[in-house]
From Swiss-Prot:
The keyword Cell inner membrane applies. It comes from the Bacteria. NCBIfam families: lgt. Catalyzes the transfer of the diacylglyceryl group from phosphatidylglycerol to the sulfhydryl group of the N-terminal cysteine of a prolipoprotein, the first step in the formation of mature lipoproteins. The keyword RNA-binding does not apply. GO terms for biological process: lipoprotein biosynthetic process. This is Phosphatidylglycerol--prolipoprotein diacylglyceryl transferase. It comes from Actinobacillus pleuropneumoniae serotype 3 (strain JL03). Pathway: Protein modification; lipoprotein biosynthesis (diacylglyceryl transfer). It is an enzyme of class 2 (transferase). Keywords: Cell inner membrane, Cell membrane, Membrane, Transferase, Transmembrane, Transmembrane helix. PROSITE patterns: LGT (PS01311). HAMAP family: Lgt. A 1,2-diacyl-sn-glycero-3-phospho-(1'-sn-glycerol) binds at residue 143.
Length: 264
C-alpha cells in the first residue's frame, strides 16, 4: 500500500564534520536565508536615495540575526518545552538539543528593531517596513531544513503526494514543511516585494507581513501533526494557531491604523 506514496529521501542531516564540529543542513539553510536577506537589504539600501546606508543595514541585519537566534530558542523552550525547562533549567542553553520557534524569533526581532531604531534615530515603523520583505526567504529555507531533518511533518493522509517519513512511523503524511516553504517562503516573499514597489504608509508593510504569515501558518496547522502534550488548546486550536491569531489581528490593526493616518 505504501508503495503508492513518496519515500522520504534519506539525507544525512550532517553535511560533514571535523572532530566535534559538524555542519548541518538545518544550520546551512539558516545561513543561506540570512545571506540572502543581507544581500537584498544591501541592494535596497543602495537604491534608497540615502534613506538607508549600507552601514545601517549591516547593523540592522546583524542585530536581527541575534534576535532570531536568541528569541527563537527561548520561544521554543517557553512555548513548547516549558515542562522540560522546569525539570532541567540548563536545557535552555543546550541549543543543539532543541529547535527554534518562529513566534519567539519574531519577538526577538522586534526587540532588535526597537534597539536599532533607537540607535539610528529613525521610526520603528520605518525599520519594520524595511526588514519585513527580507524575512520570508529565510523562513522558507528554515522549512527546507525541517524537511531534511525529518521533523515537523504533517498528519496522516492518503493524498498522492504524501511522504513516508522515517520518524513518522513510515506512515503517509502531509509534507507540511514544504507547504510552509511555499506559502511562507515563496508566496509571502513575492507578495511583500510586489507591495513595496509603490510608496506605502508607514507600518503597512510590517502589517501585511504579520497578516500573511499568520494566515498561512494558521491554515497549515490544520495538516501539521499535533503534539498531544503541548500543541492543542482544549482540542479546538493548536498552539501554533493560538500564537498566530494575535499576528493576524495585530497586522490588521496596524494596516487600518497606517491607512487611516495617511488619509488624515
Amino acid at each position: 500500500m505504501n508503495e503508492q506514496f513518496i519515500q522520504f529521501p534519506q539525507i544525512d542531516p550532517i553535511i560533514f564534520s571535523i572532530g566535534p564540529i559538524a555542519l548541518r543542513w538545518y544550520g546551512l539553510m539558516y545561513l543561506i536565508g540570512f545571506g540572502f536577506a543581507y544581500w537584498l537589504g544591501m541592494r535596497r539600501a543602495k537604491n534608497s536615495n540615502g534613506v538607508w546606508t549600507t552601514e545601517q543595514v549591516d547593523q540592522l541585519i546583524y542585530t536581527c540575526f541575534w534576535g532570531v537566534i536568541l528569541g527563537g530558542r527561548i520561544g521554543d523552550v517557553f512555548f513548547y518545552n516549558f515542562d522540560r525547562l522546569l525539570q532541567d533549567p540548563m536545557f535552555l542553553f543546550r541549543i543543539w538539543e532543541g529547535g527554534m520557534s518562529f513566534h519567539g524569533g519574531l519577538i526577538g526581532v522586534i526587540v532588535a528593531m526597537i534597539w536599532v531604531s533607537f540607535r539610528q534615530k529613525r521610526s520603528f515603523w520605518n525599520t519594520a517596513d524595511f526588514i519585513a520583505p527580507l524575512i520570508p526567504f529565510g523562513l522558507g529555507m528554515g522549512r527546507i531544513g525541517n524537511f531534511i531533518n525529518d521533523e515537523l511533518w504533517g498528519r496522516i493522509t492518503d493524498v498522492p503526494w504524501a511522504v513516508l517519513f522515517p520518524s513518522g512511523g513510515y506512515l503517509p503524511r502531509h509534507p507540511s514543511q514544504l507547504y510552509e516553504f511555499f506559502l511562507e517562503g515563496v508566496v509571502l516573499f513575492f507578495i511583500l516585494n510586489w507591495f513595496i514597489k509603490k510608496p506605502r504608509p508607514a507600518g503597512s508593510v510590517a502589517g501585511l507581513f504579520l497578516i500573511g504569515y499568520g494566515v498561512f501558518r494558521f491554515l497549515v496547522e490544520y495538516v501539521r501533526d499535533i503534539d498531544p502534550n503541548v500543541n492543542t488548546v482544549d482540542d479546538l486550536i493548536t498552539r501554533g494557531q493560538l500564537l498566530s491569531l494575535p499576528m493576524i489581528i495585530g497586522g490588521l490593526a496596524i494596516m487600518i491604523w497606517a491607512y487611516s493616518r495617511k488619509k488624515a
